[in-house]
Amino acid sequence: MTQRLGVIGSQRNGACVLASGRPWNRDMADVLGSRTGCDFVLISDPKELTTAKLTLINPKFVFFPHWSHRIDSSIYGQFECVIFHMTDLPYGRGGSPLQNLIARGIYETKISALRCVKEMDAGPIYLKKPLSLFGSAEEIFLRASGVIENMIIEILEELPEPRPQEGVTTVFKRRSPDEGNMATAESLDQAFDLIRMLDAEGYPNAFLNVGPFKIEFSRASRKSDQVLADVRISIADNAKEKDENDKNRK
């Protein structure tokens, strides 16, 4: 049975919290509740992720399948918080893991389930599972959701002891929207990867600025000598600003 934060009851004792605001995780709490028989409480608003709310729920675990917000030390210090990161840690700590991997020509990765600690993505590892990075970002995130569901069930059933990370640490920098500019692509493969790795709800699409126009790309497919994609053409922000300034001068 899955419950929301607005519902309070003693049956919540020992429940689990699922923190994610991403659309591809929308049904995960319901699915996990059905598969495990446990109460899963979904938190999608960062403002609701407070020690007061979590104390009321008293969760065994707080799972973060896709969470881009800061987790306060009062939360991970009091509750067992498990983050799911889309790299084979300690390689690829930091932001935009999916995009940074594909930009480096890496098409197979692992999802690492780790304990939340003060240093970003540095906590001990519960387990890792493989993940393919082929397809659009939306398809990859949906695929990752299925993998993460199984990982959560394994954590609940096996209660693995998290182990320190081993290997050389590599840190990724969070990518900015400007890095989606198609002018940086030097081959059809790079153009295809740039389009698909940004093709998900909530992400800025790959784009080109041509004169006053901004051309955004999605739904790419790779052919032998070309890339096919849907395009959306709009007036670029700088062109809108110039047009507004010209009107104000008249």
Predicted regions and their residues:
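One-carbon transfer enzymes
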Residues: 1-250
